[in-house]
Curated annotation (Swiss-Prot):
Organism whose genome encodes this protein: Shewanella sp. (strain ANA-3)
Record protein name field: UPF0227 protein Shewana3_2292
One Pfam family from the record: UPF0227
Family per record: Belongs to the UPF0227 family.
InterPro entries: AB_hydrolase_fold (IPR029058), UPF0227 (IPR022987), UPF0227/Esterase_YqiA (IPR008886)
């Protein structure tokens, strides 16, 4: 089973396409949707939805996959549920990058302060990160520097921030899920 968390643009047709591509790894891909506008509510909602879906999961190793803002949540929700996660162009600091896009971006900083201390250290090797060298939204080099002590970093030379084509990375994602 794969839980897919969309980015800030929840209605993008690219989300359906990425879910379709992920079905080459596991036919059971489930969209876990959230508002993107209310971080504290989103966190509670995502925790509840993943817990509900896990009740009906026979897969011994479900995987969280998120893109952009969805990767921010995949890392945290995956950690809190003991799941591996794949972070595609993760938005590590939405309290900064979401200014002017949502009502209360400062809630992300509050969530970070209330999160388990040093959660990445406790989550070492439980996530892999795929970064685009040509991400037009986020600084991929800074993201790599922040995450490389904890997670494997895979680079893509051609995809933009929304990462429409996962095909080149599907074998690595599958191997990570099964490892």
């Amino acid at each position: 089973m794969i839980f897919y968390l969309h980015g800030f643009d929840a209605t993008s047709p690219g989300n359906h396409e990425k879910m379709r591509q992920l079905q080459f790894i596991d036919p059971d891909v489930r969209l876990i949707s959230y508002s993107t506008l209310h971080p504290k509510h989103d966190m509670q909602h995502l925790l509840k939805e993943v817990a509900k879906q896990m009740q009906y999961c026979a897969d011994p190793a479900p995987l969280m996959v998120g893109v952009g803002l969805g990767a921010y949540w995949a890392e945290r929700i995956g950690f809190l549920n003991g799941l591996k996660s794949v972070l595609i162009n993760p938005n590590l600091h939405p309290e900064e990058t979401m200014q002017g896009k949502i009502d209360r971006p400062e809630e992300y900083a509050d969530i970070a302060n209330k999160c388990v201390s040093e959660f990445r250290l406790k989550n070492t090797h439980r996530a892999m990160c795929i970064l685009s060298r040509v991400d037009e939204v986020l600084d991929s080099e800074a993201t790599a520097e922040a995450l490389k002590p904890y997670y494997t970093i895979e680079w893509d030379e051609t995809q933009a921030h929304k990462f429409p084509q996962l095909a080149a990375h599907l074998p690595k994602i599958k191997a990570f899920k099964l490892s």
